[in-house]
Amino acid sequence: MGIKTQKNFICLKRTFSMNLRDAISVANPVQLEEEIKHDEVVSFLKSKNLLDKPVILNVEGKKVAKNFVSSRETLGKYLGVDAYSIARELSKIEDREAEIRVEPFSSLAMKKVDVNLQELPVIKYFPRDGGRYITAGIVIAQRNGVYNASIHRMLLLDESRVAARLVPPRHTYLMWREAVEREEELEVAVVIGTHPLFLFASATRVPSGKEFSYAAGLMGRLTLYRKGEMLVPDSEIILFGRITAETAKEGPFVDITGTYDIVRDEPVIVFDEMYVKEDYIYYSITPAGKEHQMLMGVPYEPVIYRFVSNVCKVKNVITTPGSCHYFHCVVQIEKKSEGDGKNAIIAALAANPSMKGVVVVDDDIDILSYEDMEFAIATRFQPDRDLVVVKGARGSSLDPSADKTTSKWGIDATKPLGKEGFDRVV
């Protein structure tokens, strides 16, 4: 990342930090003292009706936090906006200049411990899982002065090794391949238990090396801590290691649709050092839970917002919970010309190749209300003129109904201009 530039306002004078513990007052988690085993977490949360609610659990004597980004309302609180304003707020972040400060790693209140991943409360979520998985580990990679931060699931292999799912051609994968081709290893840090906005930034696809800048924009400013050539945020657990040329079987693992992903050969990360805070809080994302889906899909909302703004007056964008916040979206526009709805559909599908369906509505429709959206479809949409179908397009590998390519659809559920009988009285 370009952290040497003036634009990022690097400052070494004083520390400003936002961390996981700062977020507790916002997330307001239910804190449960009853001790459970690492393979009982999902069933326990279901029994308490807390599967998608912010919680801090006692897993084998260790604190485990979950679901701090499991609703639009909570994400909005971190951003200082309401649930309706998230896409608009996020669409401004990339252009926002924010301060990044760098402090020595020694200024973090952490202790070095022997590397033993088995001592962490790493969870096995479902019986058919390939093993215990770190699901909220942010991999920070550095190569040639460029930094990347992204979330990768990691299957525990032993006390010091994991198999990490690296998706080609995303940035961490490309950095690793470059290192392997030069017969080198990719130096990384894996951080667990950051502020939720740093977690969200790491789930967002931004230009190469811009995750720190994006996180700073989300958080107002960002403090990073330098250890050698590596920069890390304030975290509960920090592991330093390297992604090697060795691979190991990774999977099965439940993805956002609640279905199992396939088993693959994935790179092995070897950890050499481990640091933890006193009484650390381990952070975990439940596969296919609302938080998993939010982190996968909501970062696309500002991208769709910006794409649609190029073709018409966009008011709002949401990804829909029924589509795992990933496959479908609703776009709200202020219609000025006939054809705006169809242009919005085309722009939204172009913004995210994984998007499968788009509904475009007017600004009198409550975009967060499924009933309002269905009302718009029922009273303003005619399939023979308002339905757009795109055949043979590239879709998402996460869609079990797709076979290499997919069909995509769009519904223009906007009112025709200048016609009476469409305005709502109640």
Curated annotation (Swiss-Prot):
One of its GO terms (cellular component) is cytoplasm. Disulfide bonds: none annotated. It catalyses: (2E)-3-methyl-5-phosphooxypent-2-enoate + H(+) = isopentenyl phosphate + CO2. Pathway: Isoprenoid biosynthesis; isopentenyl diphosphate biosynthesis via mevalonate pathway. Mn(2+) binds at N148, E211. It comes from the Archaea. GO terms for biological process: isoprenoid biosynthetic process. The keyword Lyase applies. Its EC number is 4.1.1.126. The active site is at D255. Keywords: Decarboxylase, Flavoprotein, FMN, Isoprene biosynthesis, Lyase, Manganese, Metal-binding. One of its GO terms (molecular function) is metal ion binding. Pfam families: UbiD, UbiD_C. Its cofactor is prenylated FMN; Mn(2+). Belongs to the UbiD family. NCBIfam families: UbiD family decarboxylase (TIGR00148). Catalyzes the conversion of trans-anhydromevalonate 5-phosphate (tAHMP) into isopentenyl phosphate. Involved in the archaeal mevalonate (MVA) pathway, which provides fundamental precursors for isoprenoid biosynthesis, such as isopentenyl diphosphate (IPP) and dimethylallyl diphosphate (DMAPP). This is Anhydromevalonate phosphate decarboxylase.
